[in-house]
Amino acid sequence: MSLHKKKISLFAFFLLTVFTVTLKTYFSYYVDFSLGVKGLVQNLILLMNPYSLIALILSVFLFFKGKKAYWFIFIGGFLLSFLLYANVVYFRFFSDFLTFSTLNQAGNVESMGGAVGASFKWYDFVYFIDTIVYLFILIFKGSWLDKRVFSKKFVPVVMAASVALFFLNLAFAETDRPELLTRTFDHKYLVKYLGPYNFTVYDGVKTIQNNQQKALASEDDLTKVLNYTKQKNTTPNSEYFGAAKKKNIIKIHLESFQTFLINKKVNGKEVTPFLNKLSTGNEDFRYYPNFFHQTGQGKTSDAEFTMDNSLYGLPQGSAYSLKGDNTYQSLPAILDQKQGYTSDVMHGDYKTFWNRDQVYKHFGIDKFYDATYYDMSDDNIVNLGLKDKPFFKESAEYQSKMKGPFYSHLITLTNHYPFTLSEEDADIDKPNTGDSTVDGYIQTAHYLDQALEEYVTDLKKKGLYDDSVIMIYGDHYGISENHNNAMEKLLGEKITPAKFMDLNRTGFWLKIPGKEGTVDKTYAGQMDVMPTILHLVGIDSKNFLMFGTDMLSKDHNDVIPFRNGDFITKDYKYVNGKAYSNKTNELLETQPKDLDKNKKQVEKDLEMSDNVLNGDLFRFYKNPDFKKIDPSKYEYKTGPKGNQK
């Protein structure tokens, strides 16, 4: 055997570097990153996802000649290892992954520097041991390297194989988590399904797109939006303006709740007996049966976003994920600056989901009680996170220790797709539609109703009920059009496109201290909540940019736009380019007189709101009634229960 055959060929060095960097990445998945990996498919994806980009990047250096090619591969491998370790350190400190936007924030970079020493682990040498070995070979054992030119005709084959592997990885990821790239739920999800290197590329592309849109925006764009939204200003209802000044505000988010459940019975038993009682008008709550969600692909995050900012979500993706670093004039920040409210969010999932740990800083939210503040033992968890009953119980305890006035937002989880519940927690029989999603939905909605009743009882016991504004709302539909056949069996009627729009009613219940309950049939949407609450506490909404109008005002605009351009009014609905009667859901033979005007208004609303987000226009807004939020002043620490994944 000749001497050169015993040497390390360039291709062998390439393969070895790809293998060791991938091995370190795989090590980080199970030792340092809490990715919540479950099942064979997710483990297979995890095994697959680092290879493609590592191989694609390093294969470029196979075009070079001699020792220089070895050095380039080494440097490429080192930079990938450095990126991996930087993410490891950042994750240990922030439970999240590095993005270009976080690197642009000085506070994060400074924290990163301090975090290295504080979070160093004894096994961290694993991330660089191969680097040390390769460096030793390149400097001291150059004779081990085969200097012959590598055949370049194989390089495109290697690159093509890397690209093919990426698309195979993406296909598996989309199968296990549909709409992964469009909805961008959580950085952890993206890393779990794509790997840290592909995530960095994805984040870079999104950052460039956002920066380009921002660069083209100007103060003139903001002026156009302000001139448009000023036309929406409503005169406050004198009976309600200031009626809840400096009262605590409790906002309760009912996951995937739709109002077809109200007064619905299954096998003779009410699905939501407590909410049924609140919907009569005989209790303390003002019930809006014609309240619609206005979410897009961001679903839950869109509902939060719209209700706290009176802006629409994006046409694609989630504003939380894609526009989380924008400047905002949010409801909690206005309440703080004008009336001294503190604000918090309570949620039985971890803070990085939907990028909440970053977005909330830009909303000026003071505290985030995420899963690390709750008992996340196995008995308390179902589906995506903490069950609603223990969630509400622990949340009420936290709230009882708060000083008012506070704005507290509780986000439930149990009534979430795929609507699974243990036999122990299920207190109503499933219907027999033949569709496990629809059948399960009845059980989880019933459980949610029970949990809500227990929570309201706790508020009364702790003295928080009487003097608080309480909002209860459904965030978005739970049952999609894919389940129309089962829904027809459950409801006993045909689900037409017009009927499906009716099913987008998610309900809104509003308790105002000192005011009697009623059933208010006003047509309204999530966009209208922010101006309504501002007027209730005595803050005029005309001083702020909003697309919604006060539901209690006589000037309220009852044209309710949806993110896809459809809309509904008190008389008719516009679905897929056709107008239907609200009373009969039949196609209208004569076009409503105000149809064209309303279509233009809806299109303009969506366009203007998109301009605000894409151009980050609030950064230009010099509002004398509002001081810009400084996100660096907010930090959401890990709770006393810690990360229990």
Curated annotation (Swiss-Prot):
It is an enzyme of class 2 (transferase). Belongs to the LTA synthase family. Catalyzes the polymerization of lipoteichoic acid (LTA) polyglycerol phosphate, a reaction that presumably uses phosphatidylglycerol (PG) as substrate. Is required for staphylococcal growth and cell division process. Substrate binds at H416. Proteolytically cleaved. It is found in: Cell membrane. Its EC number is 2.7.8.-. GO terms for molecular function: metal ion binding; transferase activity. Its main location: membrane. It comes from Staphylococcus haemolyticus (strain JCSC1435). Gene3D superfamilies: 3.30.1120.170, Alkaline Phosphatase, subunit A. This is Lipoteichoic acid synthase. GO terms for cellular component: extracellular region; plasma membrane. Pathway: Cell wall biogenesis; lipoteichoic acid biosynthesis. The record marks A217, S218 as: Cleavage. Residues 29-43, 92-124, 175-645 are extracellular. It is a multi-pass membrane protein. The gene is ltaS. The chain crosses the membrane at residues 8-28, 44-64, 71-91, 125-145, 154-174. Mn(2+) binds at E255, T300, D475, H476. The active site is at T300.
